[in-house]
From Swiss-Prot:
Protein name as annotated: Lysozyme C
Paired cysteines (S-S): C24-C146, C48-C134, C83-C99, C95-C113
BP-aspect Gene Ontology terms: defense response to Gram-negative bacterium; defense response to Gram-positive bacterium; killing of cells of another organism
Enzyme class: hydrolase
Organism: Saguinus oedipus (Cotton-top tamarin)
């Protein structure tokens, strides 16, 4: 019985952790999903963004007490503007999706929402981590050796 409980806890922790992409695996996935060059943004910039926002973790979340919003998923997309979590006051939900969709191992919906974000006037500058860690920097290291 103890073994079954322990096994259940281990499986639960794996399910909660989500998928943490390997760097080149994510680069290939983002390229396949059409992010390389989307709105003039290089694949290396998207990779830098994902590294600094979530460390390539699909289940990453970050609560923002100021506006009571939460950032979700590999791109840390915010519930105040882009998705609906049912808890953020005055949420816009411009991507027309549940925030939980941004936490899936299959990042297709997260990529579609990220594309929606960069269509706004701020573009990729909407992400603070991109401005702090990627803007005006050599970001080639994020795709180096990946063959993309």
């Amino acid at each position: 019985m103890k073994v079954l409980i322990l096994l259940g806890l281990v499986l639960l922790s794996v399910m909660v952790q989500g998928k943490v992409f390997e760097r080149c695996e994510l680069a290939r996935t983002l390229k396949r999903l059409g992010l390389d060059g989307y709105r003039g943004i290089s694949l290396a910039n998207w990779m830098c963004l994902a590294k600094w926002e979530s460390d390539y973790n699909t289940r990453a979340t970050n609560y923002n007490p100021g506006d009571q919003s939460t950032d979700y998923g590999i791109f840390q997309i915010n519930s105040h503007y882009w998705c609906n979590n049912g808890r953020t006051p005055g949420a816009v939900n411009a991507c027309h999706i549940s925030c939980n969709a941004l936490l899936q191992d299959d990042i297709t919906e997260a990529v579609a929402c990220a594309k929606r974000v960069v269509r706004d006037p701020q573009g990729i500058r909407a992400w603070v981590a991109w401005k702090a860690h990627c803007q005006n920097r050599d970001v080639s290291q994020y795709i180096q050796g990946c063959g993309v």
